[in-house]
Amino acid sequence: MIDIDGSYGEGGGQVLRTSLSLAAITGEPIRIAGIRAGRRKPGLAAQHLTAVRAAARICHGELQGDALGSTMLEFIPGGGVKAGNYIFDVSEVQQGGSAGAITLVLQTILLPLALADGDSHITLRGGTHVIFSPTVTYIERVYLPMLCRMGIKAQVKLGAWGWYPRGGGEVNLQVKGGCQLCGLNLLERGELKRVQGLAVATELPAHIPQRMANRAENLLRTAGLRVSMQALREKGVAPGAGIFLTAEYCNSLTGFGGFGRLRLSSEKVAEIACGQLLQFHETGAPVDEHLADQLLLPAALASESSQYRVAEVSTHLTTNAAVIEKFGLGKITVNQAERVVAIASDKT
């Protein structure tokens, strides 16, 4: 059994998700102590508990410690990952429901199912666009297209928007099984082709997304960027608003967003998202801070070595690297000065 210190590094949910994915893929049993010890509320929250049970379900695994607030977990995978049709609902594990991010559940089970024999269809319910988590828009426009370059074939379709704190969102995920992962060489991003933006509001007046879109378009065009904005007013179970920007370079993709909240103007929401994008643009890096740690796992499982340059070497990145190396999957080197991540696959 592989023992993993959940308090290591940034001490968040990434340690848990990566460990679950690799345990399901390799069949290695794991024991995690100090789960999310670095967070204000340690232990398993609704989205983490859903990810734990989802990982166990797809490989008929056994669990101990799978409860809300638990800081200790044992996971013994069963007889390999089984492709199929699954439904995972974050709101079911917590009385009164939850807007926990379904994208975190998605990222936990995606690679195990992509490497399994047979195709899978998964319905995920909960929060689709939640602060401090990848949004479904980011998954659709950045994460999955980048993984496609490495051999992962998956698609997501948004069925219903789910904002904090109500949730109520739904996503359908289709995963092609039997994928063969290849390496990624991404040291230069090339010229910026365009920025695509989506400003959306549910159960709110139409002027809110339009104002976000107008402000973002003005800011980005003033900065000399080519931009195309779309403003949408959608139906939803609760009010919510946000703006989501995707920058397409010749060799890479990146995405940033901002969320509406009380006493924050639509224009300010757009300014927050644009500020993040422009700050990244100035770094010249191909890979944003968040995608940097998300690419580590597929790179470690690939048949070839990988290297990519990042905007920032975060503790999420170095923590994820340490967890992956616990499973003996190649060697990960992070050059802090050059901001280059190199993954030497053990399959080469």
Swiss-Prot record:
Function according to Swiss-Prot or TrEMBL: Catalyzes the conversion of 3'-phosphate to a 2',3'-cyclic phosphodiester at the end of RNA. The mechanism of action of the enzyme occurs in 3 steps: (A) adenylation of the enzyme by ATP; (B) transfer of adenylate to an RNA-N3'P to produce RNA-N3'PP5'A; (C) and attack of the adjacent 2'-hydroxyl on the 3'-phosphorus in the diester linkage to produce the cyclic end product. The biological role of this enzyme is unknown but it is likely to function in some aspects of cellular RNA processing.
HAMAP family: RTC
Binding site for ATP: Q107, H290, L291, A292, D293, Q294
Family to which the UniProt record says this protein belongs: Belongs to the RNA 3'-terminal cyclase family. Type 1 subfamily.
Location(s) in or outside the cell: Cytoplasm
Protein name as annotated: RNA 3'-terminal phosphate cyclase
InterPro entries, per database record: RNA3'-term_phos_cycl_insert, RNA3'_phos_cyclase_dom, RNA3'_phos_cyclase_dom_sf, RNA3'_term_phos_cyc, RNA3'_term_phos_cyc_type_1, RNA3'P_cycl/enolpyr_Trfase_a/b, RPTC_insert
GO biological process terms, semicolon-separated: RNA processing
Catalytic activities: a 3'-end 3'-phospho-ribonucleotide-RNA + ATP = a 3'-end 2',3'-cyclophospho-ribonucleotide-RNA + AMP + diphosphate
UniProt keyword terms in alphabetical order: ATP-binding, Cytoplasm, Ligase, Nucleotide-binding
Domain of life, source organism: Bacteria
